[in-house]
Amino acid sequence: MKKLGTALFLIGLLILSTLTWAEEGKETSGAIEKITYTVSQDYRCFYSKEILKRLAIGIGLAGGLANTSIDEEIQGYVQDTLRNTGTDKVSESVKPFGEGAITIPLYAGAALFGEFTKDSKLGSTTGEWGKSSLRAILVGAPPMLFLQRATGGSRPKEDGSRWMPFNDNNGVSGHSFMGAVPFLTAAKGADNLYVKCSLYLGSMLCGWSRINDNDHYFSQAALGWWVAYLAASCAGRTGKESKRLIVVPASIKDGMGALAVLYF
């Protein structure tokens, strides 16, 4: 049932993306060709020699942490020394960034908003952010899901950090992956160094929350972030023009939203 749900999720995301990119006055076949070409280029980028080499390095580093005492030592330090009511509150506020049921409709809405208001700077920027986020998820989710089970890692509350291939499905943090995507795609469109650095830091918050809540080891959160970074790099390889206006995800009361930022 879980595999079926995942498949339906990816198929639905592809269909939604196709509708999002459809332009007024063009036939559906043209829109499908456009999205097929765009996504195929994203996949070509992700499975290129350079990206796969970077992915392998990330997997190797995560494995080094998981299969030694380092992961559990980090977890113990966070739980015994760093975690408190304040970190729990922050963690609770950033956790929704990793909830696909909340964020994917937000990205789709941003993409649709961009299509209807593409002649305005705000509309085009919002649309690009939404589409890039959807594309990053579409290209990064399959390898992330595979690595979750292939590594066989378990949660801190369940077992040790060591990898036991196909024994469990928590070797990569899905929340860390999903929570990093909107910040990373926004960072790709920012030229201001301070804004870019702030967004990169923001992309790590959801992964950190999983460590704080004792739901994932450091290596699992880090690997989820790394897959998101590589996927966002491929989804954001276009649209490199300078931007003073960017759209970033924002946590609001009882939900998620987006915030437009104009910097000078």
Identify the role of each PLM range.
Residues 78-91:
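Perimembrane loop-to-helix junctions flanking transmembrane segments
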Residues 61-72:
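Alpha-helical transmembrane segments of multi-pass membrane proteins
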Residues 42, 71-75, 88:
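Acidic side chains
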Residues 55, 76-79:
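Membrane-proximal stem/loop segments at transmembrane-domain junctions that anchor or position
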